């Protein structure tokens, strides 16, 4: 097992904190500046928001379109409470648990792989509560 250097871990954590701040501020330019030009993002939302078959966005320009829609359509259950994160010097992983201070929130786990100080791959995994909320939104959109 390779133990990451403090420098590598610090760089990954810096990207994570900068991304978290940009997400909280809904700052599209700041968040996009943290991704490699050929970055990928995998999420259940990709198919829904971009209307494509695959759940993967490739490239910063396509990612910008997705993140702009996420910022515009974020449901109230998408709070951002988390207890911390894990990093191995190349990737960072964190969880938004369903049970959070103040009630339930969307249960999500995210993983980012960092290359040369920028996000290369970003994967988003949903728990059952997030899927349930998504299905309810889909149902109400069809009925509305």
Locations of regions flagged by a protein language model:
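A solvent-exposed, acidic/Ser-Thr-rich amphipathic alpha-helical stretch
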Residues: 9, 30-88
């Amino acid at each position: 097992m390779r133990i990451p250097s403090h420098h590598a871990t610090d760089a990954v954590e810096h990207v994570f904190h900068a991304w978290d701040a940009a997400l909280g501020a809904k700052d599209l330019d700041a968040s996009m500046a943290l991704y490699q030009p050929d970055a990928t993002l995998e999420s259940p939302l990709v198919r829904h928001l971009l209307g494509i078959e695959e759940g993967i966005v490739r490239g910063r320009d396509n990612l910008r379109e997705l993140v702009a829609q996420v910022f515009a359509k974020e449901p109230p259950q998408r709070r951002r409470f988390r207890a911390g994160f894990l990093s191995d010097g190349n990737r960072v992983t964190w969880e938004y648990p369903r049970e959070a201070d103040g009630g339930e929130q969307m249960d999500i786990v995210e993983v980012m792989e960092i290359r040369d100080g920028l996000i290369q791959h970003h994967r988003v995994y949903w728990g059952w509560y997030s899927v349930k909320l998504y299905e309810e939104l889909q149902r109400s959109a069809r009925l509305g």
